[in-house]
Protein backbone atom coordinates (compact mmCIF):
# COMPACT_ATOMS: atom_id res chain seq x y z
CA UNK A 1 0.00 0.00 0.00
CA UNK A 2 2.98 2.32 0.57
CA UNK A 3 4.16 2.46 -3.05
CA UNK A 4 0.85 3.68 -4.58
CA UNK A 5 0.71 6.45 -1.98
CA UNK A 6 4.29 7.51 -2.66
CA UNK A 7 3.65 7.43 -6.41
CA UNK A 8 0.53 9.60 -6.06
CA UNK A 9 2.46 12.09 -3.93
CA UNK A 10 5.33 12.20 -6.44
CA UNK A 11 2.95 12.78 -9.35
CA UNK A 12 1.20 15.60 -7.50
CA UNK A 13 4.52 17.34 -6.88
CA UNK A 14 5.55 16.93 -10.52
CA UNK A 15 2.23 18.36 -11.66
CA UNK A 16 2.69 21.32 -9.34
CA UNK A 17 6.22 22.00 -10.54
CA UNK A 18 5.10 21.88 -14.17
CA UNK A 19 2.20 24.21 -13.45
CA UNK A 20 4.50 26.68 -11.68
CA UNK A 21 6.79 27.16 -14.69
CA UNK A 22 6.61 30.40 -16.69
CA UNK A 23 3.89 30.35 -19.31
CA UNK A 24 0.25 29.31 -19.17
CA UNK A 25 -0.65 27.78 -15.85
CA UNK A 26 -3.95 26.22 -14.80
CA UNK A 27 -7.33 27.76 -15.42
CA UNK A 28 -9.02 29.43 -12.46
CA UNK A 29 -12.64 29.30 -11.34
CA UNK A 30 -13.05 31.57 -8.32
CA UNK A 31 -16.49 31.43 -6.69
CA UNK A 32 -17.68 33.92 -4.08
CA UNK A 33 -20.99 33.86 -2.25
CA UNK A 34 -22.49 36.97 -0.69
CA UNK A 35 -23.26 36.96 3.07
CA UNK A 36 -22.92 33.16 3.28
CA UNK A 37 -22.14 31.92 6.79
CA UNK A 38 -19.58 29.22 7.47
CA UNK A 39 -22.32 27.32 9.29
CA UNK A 40 -24.54 27.16 6.20
CA UNK A 41 -22.62 24.39 4.40
CA UNK A 42 -22.71 20.67 4.95
CA UNK A 43 -18.94 20.38 4.71
CA UNK A 44 -18.65 22.78 7.67
CA UNK A 45 -21.14 20.91 9.81
CA UNK A 46 -24.62 21.98 8.68
CA UNK A 47 -27.03 19.05 8.69
CA UNK A 48 -30.25 20.74 7.57
CA UNK A 49 -29.28 22.53 4.34
CA UNK A 50 -28.52 20.54 1.21
CA UNK A 51 -25.24 21.65 -0.39
CA UNK A 52 -23.92 18.50 -2.12
CA UNK A 53 -22.09 20.28 -4.95
CA UNK A 54 -20.19 22.64 -2.65
CA UNK A 55 -19.52 19.73 -0.30
CA UNK A 56 -18.05 17.88 -3.28
CA UNK A 57 -15.33 20.53 -3.51
CA UNK A 58 -14.37 19.79 0.09
CA UNK A 59 -14.21 16.05 -0.61
CA UNK A 60 -12.14 16.51 -3.76
CA UNK A 61 -9.90 19.27 -2.43
CA UNK A 62 -8.78 21.10 0.69
CA UNK A 63 -11.03 22.60 3.34
CA UNK A 64 -9.59 25.66 5.06
CA UNK A 65 -11.02 25.80 8.57
CA UNK A 66 -9.54 29.15 9.61
CA UNK A 67 -10.04 31.09 6.38
CA UNK A 68 -10.54 34.79 7.07
CA UNK A 69 -12.02 37.66 5.11
CA UNK A 70 -9.88 40.79 5.13
CA UNK A 71 -12.95 42.84 6.06
CA UNK A 72 -16.41 41.99 7.43
CA UNK A 73 -18.30 44.00 4.77
CA UNK A 74 -18.88 43.44 1.05
CA UNK A 75 -17.07 46.33 -0.63
CA UNK A 76 -13.80 46.33 1.36
CA UNK A 77 -13.60 42.53 1.45
CA UNK A 78 -13.95 42.29 -2.33
CA UNK A 79 -11.35 45.00 -2.85
CA UNK A 80 -8.92 43.01 -0.69
CA UNK A 81 -9.74 39.76 -2.50
CA UNK A 82 -9.04 41.23 -5.94
CA UNK A 83 -5.84 43.08 -4.98
CA UNK A 84 -4.30 40.99 -2.20
CA UNK A 85 -4.13 44.13 -0.04
CA UNK A 86 -5.87 45.34 3.08
CA UNK A 87 -8.64 47.65 1.85
CA UNK A 88 -7.34 50.54 3.94
CA UNK A 89 -4.32 50.66 1.58
CA UNK A 90 -6.51 51.43 -1.45
CA UNK A 91 -8.89 53.82 0.29
CA UNK A 92 -11.63 51.18 0.19
CA UNK A 93 -12.29 51.32 3.94
CA UNK A 94 -14.70 53.89 5.31
CA UNK A 95 -14.04 56.40 8.09
CA UNK A 96 -17.78 57.04 8.46
CA UNK A 97 -21.02 55.22 9.07
CA UNK A 98 -21.53 53.83 5.56
CA UNK A 99 -18.96 51.18 4.65
CA UNK A 100 -20.26 50.09 1.23
CA UNK A 101 -21.64 51.61 -1.96
CA UNK A 102 -25.44 51.79 -2.12
CA UNK A 103 -25.83 53.84 -5.31
CA UNK A 104 -24.75 53.02 -8.84
CA UNK A 105 -24.17 56.74 -9.43
CA UNK A 106 -21.52 57.17 -6.73
CA UNK A 107 -18.08 58.44 -7.72
CA UNK A 108 -16.06 56.20 -5.39
CA UNK A 109 -14.71 52.79 -6.28
CA UNK A 110 -11.65 50.60 -6.66
CA UNK A 111 -8.98 53.07 -7.82
CA UNK A 112 -7.75 52.59 -11.41
CA UNK A 113 -4.15 52.32 -10.21
CA UNK A 114 -4.89 49.21 -8.15
CA UNK A 115 -3.67 45.93 -9.67
CA UNK A 116 -6.16 43.04 -9.61
CA UNK A 117 -5.41 39.41 -10.32
CA UNK A 118 -7.45 39.83 -13.51
CA UNK A 119 -5.04 42.52 -14.74
CA UNK A 120 -2.04 40.33 -13.95
CA UNK A 121 -3.46 37.31 -15.75
CA UNK A 122 -4.41 39.28 -18.84
CA UNK A 123 -0.72 40.03 -19.13
CA UNK A 124 -0.06 36.29 -19.11
CA UNK A 125 -2.43 35.58 -21.99
CA UNK A 126 -5.47 34.63 -19.93
CA UNK A 127 -9.04 35.47 -20.89
CA UNK A 128 -10.80 36.86 -17.83
CA UNK A 129 -14.46 37.06 -16.91
CA UNK A 130 -16.67 38.25 -14.07
CA UNK A 131 -20.22 36.94 -13.73
CA UNK A 132 -22.43 38.36 -10.99
CA UNK A 133 -21.84 41.02 -8.37
CA UNK A 134 -19.13 43.72 -8.58
CA UNK A 135 -19.90 46.32 -5.83
CA UNK A 136 -16.66 48.24 -6.35
CA UNK A 137 -17.89 51.34 -8.13
CA UNK A 138 -18.67 52.30 -11.70
CA UNK A 139 -17.73 55.83 -12.83
CA UNK A 140 -15.73 58.81 -11.55
CA UNK A 141 -16.59 62.10 -13.25
CA UNK A 142 -18.92 61.20 -16.11
CA UNK A 143 -21.37 58.34 -16.57
CA UNK A 144 -19.43 57.15 -19.59
CA UNK A 145 -15.91 57.10 -18.11
CA UNK A 146 -16.46 53.74 -16.32
CA UNK A 147 -13.25 54.30 -14.38
CA UNK A 148 -14.18 51.70 -11.72
CA UNK A 149 -15.91 49.23 -14.06
CA UNK A 150 -14.69 45.59 -14.08
CA UNK A 151 -13.55 46.14 -17.67
CA UNK A 152 -11.07 48.74 -16.41
CA UNK A 153 -9.73 46.29 -13.85
CA UNK A 154 -8.74 43.48 -16.17
CA UNK A 155 -11.97 41.62 -16.92
CA UNK A 156 -12.57 40.92 -20.61
CA UNK A 157 -16.18 39.95 -19.98
CA UNK A 158 -18.67 41.21 -17.39
CA UNK A 159 -22.26 40.16 -16.95
CA UNK A 160 -23.93 41.09 -13.70
CA UNK A 161 -24.71 43.99 -11.44
CA UNK A 162 -22.23 46.80 -10.83
CA UNK A 163 -23.73 47.39 -7.38
CA UNK A 164 -25.25 44.77 -5.10
CA UNK A 165 -28.44 42.97 -4.22
CA UNK A 166 -30.57 44.82 -1.67
CA UNK A 167 -34.01 44.39 -0.14
CA UNK A 168 -35.13 47.48 -2.04
CA UNK A 169 -34.27 45.78 -5.34
CA UNK A 170 -37.14 43.32 -5.10
CA UNK A 171 -40.79 44.37 -4.74
CA UNK A 172 -42.06 43.25 -1.36
CA UNK A 173 -38.55 42.72 -0.02
CA UNK A 174 -38.60 45.61 2.42
CA UNK A 175 -35.97 48.33 2.67
CA UNK A 176 -32.45 48.75 4.04
CA UNK A 177 -33.22 52.37 4.85
CA UNK A 178 -35.24 51.67 8.00
CA UNK A 179 -32.82 53.39 10.40
CA UNK A 180 -32.35 56.29 7.98
CA UNK A 181 -36.12 56.57 7.77
CA UNK A 182 -36.22 57.18 11.53
CA UNK A 183 -33.69 60.03 11.28
CA UNK A 184 -34.71 61.70 8.03
CA UNK A 185 -38.45 61.03 7.91
CA UNK A 186 -40.01 59.98 11.22
CA UNK A 187 -38.13 62.49 13.38
CA UNK A 188 -38.78 65.53 11.12
CA UNK A 189 -42.41 64.49 10.67
CA UNK A 190 -42.84 64.17 14.45
CA UNK A 191 -41.30 67.59 15.02
CA UNK A 192 -43.38 69.24 12.32
CA UNK A 193 -46.49 67.43 13.54
CA UNK A 194 -45.85 68.63 17.10
CA UNK A 195 -45.41 72.20 15.87
CA UNK A 196 -48.64 71.97 13.89
CA UNK A 197 -50.53 70.53 16.86
CA UNK A 198 -49.13 73.18 19.25
CA UNK A 199 -50.20 75.99 16.92
CA UNK A 200 -53.68 74.50 16.55
CA UNK A 201 -54.10 74.12 20.33
CA UNK A 202 -52.81 77.64 20.97
CA UNK A 203 -55.25 79.01 18.41
CA UNK A 204 -58.15 76.97 19.87
CA UNK A 205 -57.38 78.08 23.44
CA UNK A 206 -57.05 81.70 22.40
CA UNK A 207 -53.45 81.88 23.61
CA UNK A 208 -52.05 82.88 20.23
CA UNK A 209 -53.15 83.33 16.65
CA UNK A 210 -50.35 82.09 14.39
CA UNK A 211 -50.70 83.45 10.84
CA UNK A 212 -52.29 81.14 8.32
CA UNK A 213 -49.15 81.05 6.20
CA UNK A 214 -47.26 79.42 9.10
CA UNK A 215 -49.79 76.58 9.07
CA UNK A 216 -49.38 76.34 5.31
CA UNK A 217 -45.58 76.23 5.45
CA UNK A 218 -45.63 73.54 8.14
CA UNK A 219 -48.07 71.36 6.20
CA UNK A 220 -46.03 71.90 3.02
CA UNK A 221 -42.84 70.89 4.84
CA UNK A 222 -44.50 67.68 6.05
CA UNK A 223 -45.70 66.92 2.53
CA UNK A 224 -42.22 67.63 1.15
CA UNK A 225 -40.50 65.28 3.62
CA UNK A 226 -42.99 62.48 3.03
CA UNK A 227 -43.08 62.99 -0.72
CA UNK A 228 -39.30 63.06 -1.02
CA UNK A 229 -39.01 59.76 0.84
CA UNK A 230 -41.68 58.07 -1.27
CA UNK A 231 -40.01 59.35 -4.45
CA UNK A 232 -36.62 58.13 -3.21
CA UNK A 233 -37.90 54.60 -2.58
CA UNK A 234 -39.81 54.57 -5.88
CA UNK A 235 -36.78 55.50 -7.97
CA UNK A 236 -34.13 53.65 -5.95
CA UNK A 237 -34.85 50.27 -7.51
CA UNK A 238 -34.52 51.14 -11.22
CA UNK A 239 -31.67 53.59 -10.59
CA UNK A 240 -29.51 51.11 -8.68
CA UNK A 241 -30.70 47.58 -9.37
CA UNK A 242 -29.84 46.66 -12.95
CA UNK A 243 -27.82 44.21 -15.00
CA UNK A 244 -25.04 44.99 -17.45
CA UNK A 245 -23.29 43.06 -20.19
CA UNK A 246 -19.85 44.63 -20.38
CA UNK A 247 -20.57 48.38 -20.61
CA UNK A 248 -24.24 48.17 -21.62
CA UNK A 249 -27.31 47.94 -19.42
CA UNK A 250 -29.39 44.96 -20.45
CA UNK A 251 -32.11 44.99 -17.79
CA UNK A 252 -33.39 47.81 -15.60
CA UNK A 253 -34.59 47.15 -12.96
CA UNK A 254 -33.32 43.63 -12.30
CA UNK A 255 -35.84 40.84 -12.79
CA UNK A 256 -35.09 38.12 -10.23
CA UNK A 257 -36.98 35.42 -12.10
CA UNK A 258 -34.39 32.95 -13.37
CA UNK A 259 -31.49 35.21 -12.34
CA UNK A 260 -29.32 32.50 -10.81
CA UNK A 261 -29.99 30.27 -13.82
CA UNK A 262 -28.90 33.08 -16.11
CA UNK A 263 -25.67 33.64 -14.20
CA UNK A 264 -24.91 29.91 -14.25
CA UNK A 265 -25.63 29.81 -17.99
CA UNK A 266 -23.34 32.77 -18.64
CA UNK A 267 -20.58 31.09 -16.61
CA UNK A 268 -21.01 27.91 -18.65
CA UNK A 269 -20.91 29.87 -21.91
CA UNK A 270 -17.69 31.57 -20.81
CA UNK A 271 -16.08 28.19 -20.12
CA UNK A 272 -17.16 26.82 -23.48
CA UNK A 273 -15.92 29.87 -25.38
CA UNK A 274 -12.53 29.67 -23.74
CA UNK A 275 -12.00 25.94 -23.45
CA UNK A 276 -8.90 26.12 -25.66
CA UNK A 277 -7.26 29.11 -23.98
CA UNK A 278 -6.20 29.74 -20.38
CA UNK A 279 -8.95 31.51 -18.47
CA UNK A 280 -9.89 33.02 -15.14
CA UNK A 281 -13.58 33.19 -14.25
CA UNK A 282 -14.77 35.01 -11.14
CA UNK A 283 -18.29 33.78 -10.41
CA UNK A 284 -19.64 36.24 -7.85
CA UNK A 285 -23.11 35.15 -6.74
CA UNK A 286 -25.83 37.58 -5.71
CA UNK A 287 -27.02 34.83 -3.35
CA UNK A 288 -27.46 34.81 -0.39
CA UNK A 289 -27.70 38.53 0.32
CA UNK A 290 -31.21 39.88 0.70
CA UNK A 291 -33.50 40.34 -1.10
CA UNK A 292 -33.88 36.56 -1.24
CA UNK A 293 -35.10 34.92 -4.41
CA UNK A 294 -35.30 31.45 -5.90
CA UNK A 295 -36.93 29.84 -8.89
CA UNK A 296 -40.11 27.82 -8.30
CA UNK A 297 -38.23 24.51 -8.23
CA UNK A 298 -36.30 25.74 -5.16
CA UNK A 299 -38.79 28.08 -3.49
CA UNK A 300 -40.23 26.55 -0.33
CA UNK A 301 -38.10 23.42 -0.59
CA UNK A 302 -35.57 24.00 2.19
CA UNK A 303 -35.95 23.76 5.95
CA UNK A 304 -34.82 27.35 6.43
CA UNK A 305 -37.30 29.45 4.52
CA UNK A 306 -36.29 31.90 1.82
CA UNK A 307 -32.68 31.98 3.01
CA UNK A 308 -32.32 28.21 2.80
CA UNK A 309 -33.96 28.18 -0.63
CA UNK A 310 -31.35 30.68 -1.83
CA UNK A 311 -28.47 28.60 -0.42
CA UNK A 312 -29.74 25.46 -2.13
CA UNK A 313 -30.31 27.23 -5.44
CA UNK A 314 -26.77 28.60 -5.30
CA UNK A 315 -25.42 25.12 -4.60
CA UNK A 316 -27.30 23.87 -7.67
CA UNK A 317 -25.67 26.60 -9.76
CA UNK A 318 -22.22 25.62 -8.47
CA UNK A 319 -23.01 22.07 -9.54
CA UNK A 320 -23.97 23.23 -13.03
CA UNK A 321 -20.68 25.04 -13.51
CA UNK A 322 -18.64 22.13 -12.14
CA UNK A 323 -20.51 19.79 -14.49
CA UNK A 324 -19.57 22.02 -17.42
CA UNK A 325 -15.91 21.79 -16.42
CA UNK A 326 -16.25 18.00 -16.38
CA UNK A 327 -18.00 17.84 -19.76
CA UNK A 328 -15.35 20.03 -21.37
CA UNK A 329 -12.53 17.95 -19.91
CA UNK A 330 -11.19 20.98 -18.03
CA UNK A 331 -11.55 19.84 -14.42
CA UNK A 332 -8.01 18.51 -14.03
CA UNK A 333 -6.46 21.74 -15.28
CA UNK A 334 -8.68 24.13 -13.34
CA UNK A 335 -8.10 25.34 -9.81
CA UNK A 336 -11.49 25.92 -8.19
CA UNK A 337 -11.79 28.13 -5.12
CA UNK A 338 -14.99 28.87 -3.20
CA UNK A 339 -15.54 31.33 -0.37
CA UNK A 340 -17.87 34.02 1.02
CA UNK A 341 -17.08 37.71 1.18
CA UNK A 342 -17.64 37.70 4.98
CA UNK A 343 -19.78 36.09 7.63
CA UNK A 344 -23.55 35.79 7.71
CA UNK A 345 -25.74 38.81 8.47
CA UNK A 346 -27.26 37.77 11.78
CA UNK A 347 -29.40 40.92 12.12
CA UNK A 348 -31.11 40.43 8.76
CA UNK A 349 -34.85 40.02 9.22
CA UNK A 350 -37.59 39.75 6.61
CA UNK A 351 -40.51 42.18 6.18
CA UNK A 352 -42.56 40.11 8.64
CA UNK A 353 -39.77 39.70 11.19
CA UNK A 354 -38.67 36.24 10.05
CA UNK A 355 -34.94 35.48 10.06
CA UNK A 356 -33.32 36.13 6.69
CA UNK A 357 -29.68 35.82 7.73
CA UNK A 358 -27.50 32.74 7.78
CA UNK A 359 -25.50 30.81 10.35
CA UNK A 360 -21.96 31.44 11.50
CA UNK A 361 -21.89 28.12 13.30
CA UNK A 362 -20.23 28.23 16.69
CA UNK A 363 -18.67 31.63 16.05
CA UNK A 364 -19.64 34.86 17.75
CA UNK A 365 -20.86 37.92 15.86
CA UNK A 366 -21.37 38.28 12.14
CA UNK A 367 -21.24 40.62 9.19
CA UNK A 368 -19.80 44.09 9.91
CA UNK A 369 -17.80 43.13 13.01
CA UNK A 370 -14.49 41.40 13.63
CA UNK A 371 -15.62 38.67 15.97
CA UNK A 372 -14.89 35.34 14.27
CA UNK A 373 -18.47 35.11 12.99
CA UNK A 374 -17.90 38.21 10.88
CA UNK A 375 -14.62 37.19 9.28
CA UNK A 376 -14.26 33.39 9.37
CA UNK A 377 -15.59 32.15 6.05
CA UNK A 378 -15.68 28.96 3.98
CA UNK A 379 -12.50 28.28 2.03
CA UNK A 380 -12.44 25.35 -0.40
CA UNK A 381 -9.69 24.72 -2.96
CA UNK A 382 -9.72 21.92 -5.54
CA UNK A 383 -7.13 21.06 -8.18
CA UNK A 384 -7.31 17.38 -9.17
CA UNK A 385 -3.96 15.67 -9.54
CA UNK A 386 -2.14 18.42 -7.70
CA UNK A 387 -3.91 18.98 -4.38
CA UNK A 388 -4.46 15.79 -2.40
CA UNK A 389 -8.23 15.47 -1.82
CA UNK A 390 -9.96 15.33 1.53
CA UNK A 391 -7.51 17.46 3.48
CA UNK A 392 -8.24 20.01 6.19
CA UNK A 393 -5.89 22.93 6.85
CA UNK A 394 -6.38 24.54 10.24
CA UNK A 395 -3.81 27.31 9.81
CA UNK A 396 -4.93 30.96 9.49
CA UNK A 397 -5.34 31.99 5.86
CA UNK A 398 -6.90 35.02 4.18
CA UNK A 399 -8.99 35.78 1.12
CA UNK A 400 -6.11 38.11 0.19
CA UNK A 401 -4.01 34.98 -0.40
CA UNK A 402 -5.81 34.24 -3.66
CA UNK A 403 -4.04 37.15 -5.39
CA UNK A 404 -0.43 35.92 -4.97
CA UNK A 405 -1.47 32.28 -5.38
CA UNK A 406 -3.13 32.90 -8.73
CA UNK A 407 -0.31 35.18 -9.87
CA UNK A 408 2.41 32.66 -9.11
CA UNK A 409 0.61 29.74 -10.74
CA UNK A 410 0.00 31.83 -13.86
CA UNK A 411 3.66 32.84 -14.02
CA UNK A 412 2.99 36.52 -13.29
CA UNK A 413 5.29 38.76 -11.30
CA UNK A 414 3.79 40.43 -8.25
CA UNK A 415 3.85 44.24 -8.25
CA UNK A 416 6.94 45.58 -6.50
CA UNK A 417 5.75 49.17 -6.09
CA UNK A 418 3.23 48.39 -3.33
CA UNK A 419 2.71 46.19 -0.31
CA UNK A 420 1.00 42.87 -1.03
CA UNK A 421 -0.52 41.47 2.15
CA UNK A 422 -1.62 38.09 0.80
CA UNK A 423 0.60 35.00 0.84
CA UNK A 424 0.89 32.16 -1.65
CA UNK A 425 -1.33 29.32 -0.46
CA UNK A 426 0.24 26.51 -2.47
CA UNK A 427 3.09 25.57 -0.09
CA UNK A 428 0.51 25.14 2.68
CA UNK A 429 -1.99 23.28 0.48
CA UNK A 430 0.69 20.90 -0.76
CA UNK A 431 2.10 20.22 2.69
CA UNK A 432 5.47 21.81 1.95
CA UNK A 433 5.08 23.96 5.07
CA UNK A 434 3.16 23.28 8.26
CA UNK A 435 2.49 26.83 9.39
CA UNK A 436 0.74 29.77 7.82
CA UNK A 437 2.98 32.46 6.37
CA UNK A 438 0.71 34.94 8.16
CA UNK A 439 2.38 35.29 11.53
CA UNK A 440 0.12 38.29 12.11
CA UNK A 441 -3.23 39.21 10.58
CA UNK A 442 -4.92 42.57 11.11
CA UNK A 443 -8.68 42.83 11.35
CA UNK A 444 -10.29 46.12 10.38
CA UNK A 445 -13.76 47.41 11.13
CA UNK A 446 -14.07 49.90 8.26
CA UNK A 447 -10.83 51.94 8.41
CA UNK A 448 -10.24 51.28 12.12
CA UNK A 449 -7.88 48.56 13.34
CA UNK A 450 -10.15 46.50 15.56
CA UNK A 451 -8.14 43.38 16.32
CA UNK A 452 -4.83 41.61 15.71
CA UNK A 453 -4.27 37.87 15.39
CA UNK A 454 -0.90 36.21 16.06
CA UNK A 455 0.07 32.68 15.05
CA UNK A 456 3.48 32.05 16.67
CA UNK A 457 5.27 29.18 14.96
CA UNK A 458 6.59 27.77 18.23
CA UNK A 459 3.13 27.30 19.68
CA UNK A 460 -0.24 25.79 18.86
CA UNK A 461 -2.02 28.96 20.02
CA UNK A 462 -3.63 31.59 17.83
CA UNK A 463 -3.83 34.77 19.88
CA UNK A 464 -6.38 37.44 19.06
CA UNK A 465 -6.41 40.85 20.73
CA UNK A 466 -9.32 43.29 20.39
CA UNK A 467 -8.74 47.03 20.64
CA UNK A 468 -12.48 47.58 20.50
CA UNK A 469 -15.63 45.50 20.11
CA UNK A 470 -19.17 46.40 19.03
CA UNK A 471 -21.89 47.05 21.57
CA UNK A 472 -24.49 44.43 20.77
CA UNK A 473 -28.06 45.69 20.93
CA UNK A 474 -30.08 44.48 22.69
CA UNK A 475 -27.43 43.61 25.31
CA UNK A 476 -26.75 39.90 25.49
CA UNK A 477 -27.72 39.31 21.86
CA UNK A 478 -25.36 38.34 19.05
CA UNK A 479 -25.75 41.43 16.88
CA UNK A 480 -26.62 45.10 16.55
CA UNK A 481 -30.30 44.86 15.71
CA UNK A 482 -31.16 48.52 16.27
CA UNK A 483 -28.73 49.65 13.54
CA UNK A 484 -29.12 46.60 11.23
CA UNK A 485 -25.32 46.11 11.26
CA UNK A 486 -22.72 46.96 13.88
CA UNK A 487 -20.96 50.31 13.66
CA UNK A 488 -17.23 50.85 14.11
CA UNK A 489 -16.91 54.07 16.08
CA UNK A 490 -18.30 56.37 18.75
CA UNK A 491 -20.84 55.13 21.25
CA UNK A 492 -21.42 52.02 19.14
CA UNK A 493 -18.18 50.39 20.36
CA UNK A 494 -16.33 49.68 23.59
CA UNK A 495 -12.57 50.28 23.62
CA UNK A 496 -10.34 47.91 25.58
CA UNK A 497 -7.16 48.94 27.42
CA UNK A 498 -5.50 46.55 27.82
CA UNK A 499 -6.82 44.81 24.72
CA UNK A 500 -9.23 41.92 25.12
CA UNK A 501 -7.17 38.75 24.57
CA UNK A 502 -8.35 35.31 23.40
CA UNK A 503 -6.66 32.11 22.29
CA UNK A 504 -8.98 31.18 19.45
CA UNK A 505 -7.24 27.84 18.94
CA UNK A 506 -8.67 26.80 22.31
CA UNK A 507 -11.60 29.20 22.53
CA UNK A 508 -12.93 29.64 18.97
CA UNK A 509 -16.24 30.91 20.35
CA UNK A 510 -14.39 33.86 21.92
CA UNK A 511 -16.25 33.49 25.20
CA UNK A 512 -13.39 33.52 27.73
CA UNK A 513 -11.06 36.54 27.66
CA UNK A 514 -7.64 35.77 29.09
CA UNK A 515 -6.20 37.65 32.04
CA UNK A 516 -2.79 37.73 33.73
CA UNK A 517 -4.22 35.19 36.18
CA UNK A 518 -5.33 32.73 33.48
CA UNK A 519 -2.43 33.30 31.05
CA UNK A 520 1.01 33.88 32.62
CA UNK A 521 2.40 35.41 29.40
CA UNK A 522 -0.54 37.81 29.05
CA UNK A 523 1.55 40.99 29.14
CA UNK A 524 4.29 39.63 26.89
CA UNK A 525 1.78 38.44 24.29
CA UNK A 526 0.03 41.81 24.16
CA UNK A 527 3.35 43.66 23.87
CA UNK A 528 4.36 41.50 20.90
CA UNK A 529 1.01 42.04 19.21
CA UNK A 530 1.07 45.77 19.86
CA UNK A 531 4.54 46.00 18.32
CA UNK A 532 3.31 44.11 15.25
CA UNK A 533 0.29 46.41 14.96
CA UNK A 534 2.48 49.52 15.14
CA UNK A 535 4.84 48.09 12.52
CA UNK A 536 1.88 47.32 10.26
CA UNK A 537 0.37 50.79 10.64
CA UNK A 538 3.75 52.29 9.76
CA UNK A 539 3.51 50.63 6.31
CA UNK A 540 0.21 52.36 5.48
CA UNK A 541 0.33 55.22 3.01
CA UNK A 542 -2.47 57.74 2.80
CA UNK A 543 -4.93 56.95 0.02
CA UNK A 544 -7.96 58.97 -1.14
CA UNK A 545 -11.00 57.81 0.79
CA UNK A 546 -13.24 56.14 -1.78
CA UNK A 547 -16.04 55.76 0.77
CA UNK A 548 -16.20 59.37 1.94
CA UNK A 549 -19.63 60.98 2.06
CA UNK A 550 -18.92 62.85 -1.17
CA UNK A 551 -17.87 59.64 -2.92
CA UNK A 552 -20.78 57.46 -1.77
CA UNK A 553 -23.45 60.10 -2.41
CA UNK A 554 -25.77 59.76 -5.43
CA UNK A 555 -24.76 62.03 -8.32
CA UNK A 556 -27.42 62.49 -11.01
CA UNK A 557 -24.84 63.13 -13.76
CA UNK A 558 -23.39 59.64 -13.12
CA UNK A 559 -26.74 57.85 -13.34
CA UNK A 560 -26.94 55.20 -16.05
CA UNK A 561 -30.19 54.27 -17.79
CA UNK A 562 -31.20 52.14 -20.72
CA UNK A 563 -30.74 54.13 -23.95
CA UNK A 564 -34.50 54.37 -24.42
CA UNK A 565 -34.89 56.16 -21.08
CA UNK A 566 -31.98 58.57 -20.71
CA UNK A 567 -33.28 60.70 -17.83
CA UNK A 568 -32.19 59.60 -14.31
CA UNK A 569 -35.78 59.71 -13.04
CA UNK A 570 -37.14 57.73 -15.99
CA UNK A 571 -35.14 54.52 -15.56
CA UNK A 572 -38.15 52.39 -14.72
CA UNK A 573 -38.18 50.13 -17.75
CA UNK A 574 -37.15 46.56 -18.42
CA UNK A 575 -34.67 45.54 -21.07
CA UNK A 576 -34.63 42.32 -22.99
CA UNK A 577 -32.98 40.56 -20.06
Curated annotation (Swiss-Prot):
Binding of Ca(2+), residues: 34-35, 74, 341-342
Swiss-Prot/TrEMBL catalytic activity: dehydroepiandrosterone 3-sulfate + H2O = 3beta-hydroxyandrost-5-en-17-one + sulfate + H(+); estrone 3-sulfate + H2O = estrone + sulfate + H(+)
Gene Ontology biological-process entries: female pregnancy; learning or memory; positive regulation of cell population proliferation; response to estrogen; response to peptide hormone; response to pH; skin development; steroid metabolic process
Residues found modified as 3-oxoalanine (Cys): 74
Record has Calcium as a keyword: yes
Cofactor binding annotation: Binds 1 Ca(2+) ion per subunit.
Transmembrane residue ranges: 184-207, 212-233
The keyword Glycoprotein belongs to this UniProt entry's keyword annotation: yes
Gene Ontology terms, MF aspect: arylsulfatase activity; metal ion binding; steryl-sulfatase activity; sulfuric ester hydrolase activity
Lumenal domain ranges by topology: 21-183, 234-577
Keywords: Calcium, Disulfide bond, Endoplasmic reticulum, Glycoprotein, Hydrolase, Lipid metabolism, Membrane, Metal-binding, Microsome, Pregnancy, Signal, Steroid metabolism, Transmembrane, Transmembrane helix
Residue ranges, Cytoplasmic side: 208-211
The protein's required cofactors: Ca(2+)
Membrane topology: Multi-pass membrane protein
Residues forming coiled coils: none
Complex formation: Homodimer.
Function, in words: Catalyzes the conversion of sulfated steroid precursors, such as dehydroepiandrosterone sulfate (DHEA-S) and estrone sulfate to the free steroid.
The protein, known as: Steryl-sulfatase
Originating species: Rattus norvegicus
Gene that specifies this protein: Sts
Amino acid sequence: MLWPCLLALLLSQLNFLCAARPGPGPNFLLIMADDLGIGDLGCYGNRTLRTPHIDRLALEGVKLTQHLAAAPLCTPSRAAFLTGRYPVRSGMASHGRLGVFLFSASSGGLPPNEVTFAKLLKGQGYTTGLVGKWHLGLSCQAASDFCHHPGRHGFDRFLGTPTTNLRDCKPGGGTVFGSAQQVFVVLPMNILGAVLLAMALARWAGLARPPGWVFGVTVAAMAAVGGAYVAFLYHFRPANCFLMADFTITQQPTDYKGLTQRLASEAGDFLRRNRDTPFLLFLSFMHVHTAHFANPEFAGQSLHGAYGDAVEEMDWAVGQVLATLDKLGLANNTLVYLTSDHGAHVEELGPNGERHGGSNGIYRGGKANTWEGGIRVPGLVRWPGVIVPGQEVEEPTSNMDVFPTVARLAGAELPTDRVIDGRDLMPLLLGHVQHSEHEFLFHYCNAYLSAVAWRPHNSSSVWKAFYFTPNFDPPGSNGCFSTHVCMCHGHHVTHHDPPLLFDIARDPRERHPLTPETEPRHGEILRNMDAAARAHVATLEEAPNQLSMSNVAWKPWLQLCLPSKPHPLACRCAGDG
